[in-house]
Amino acid sequence: MLKPLGDRVVLKIEEKEQTVGGFVLAGSAQEKTKTAQVVATGQGVRTLNGDLVAPSVKTGDRVLVEAHAGLDVKDGDEKYIIVGEVNILAIIEE
């Protein structure tokens, strides 16, 4: 399993029509964003005075992420993307 560092997040992209709260996203919005599930998160980032700021997302969250963000990786037969937390636009609450 992949364990990201810092504020990076491992995502599994959902390959289906994107909906948010039951609403289907417009075609142009689907081209700019992807729906994904958080598989793993880094520990967070440290501030200048050394405090650790934990990620805002957790394993299992469904999120909306920028379509062209991140790095495509494989772990065995599974495909994932690794993104910085800054590229996650929203948590999808159901």
Swiss-Prot record:
GO terms for cellular component: cytoplasm. InterPro entries: Chaperonin_GroES, Chaperonin_GroES_sf, Chaprnonin_Cpn10_CS, GroES-like_sf. It comes from the Bacteria. It is found in: Cytoplasm. Its main location: cytoplasm. Together with the chaperonin GroEL, plays an essential role in assisting protein folding. The GroEL-GroES system forms a nano-cage that allows encapsulation of the non-native substrate proteins and provides a physical environment optimized to promote and accelerate protein folding. GroES binds to the apical surface of the GroEL ring, thereby capping the opening of the GroEL channel. PANTHER family: 10 KDA HEAT SHOCK PROTEIN, CO-CHAPERONIN GROES. Heptamer of 7 subunits arranged in a ring. Interacts with the chaperonin GroEL. This is Co-chaperonin GroES. It comes from Streptococcus pneumoniae (strain 70585).
